[in-house]
Amino acid sequence: MSQKKVALECTKCGARNYTITANPQRQERLELRKFCKHCGEYTIHRESR
């Protein structure tokens, strides 16, 4: 299986702050709690495709 680069987007402001490699066959989108430098706080970042 090949890995694909995907961006993690802040759910509060919409900024794409992080990129990760993920398996494209997954059905659900990845959600992580990360620091957003635009909001200045920890928010949920969702995988954008």
UniProtKB/Swiss-Prot annotation:
GO MF terms, alphabetically ordered: structural constituent of ribosome
GO biological process, one term: translation
Keyword Membrane among record annotations: no
Disulfide links within the chain: none
Pfam families: Ribosomal_L33
A GO-annotated cellular component: ribonucleoprotein complex
Record's keyword terms, sorted: Ribonucleoprotein, Ribosomal protein
InterPro entries: Ribosomal_bL33, Ribosomal_bL33_sf, Ribosomal_zn-bd
Keyword Ribosomal protein annotated: yes
Protein family according to the UniProt entry: Belongs to the bacterial ribosomal protein bL33 family.
NCBIfam families found in the cross-reference section: PRK00504.1, rpmG_bact
Protein name per Swiss-Prot or TrEMBL: Large ribosomal subunit protein bL33A
Organism from which the protein derives: Limosilactobacillus reuteri subsp. reuteri (strain JCM 1112)
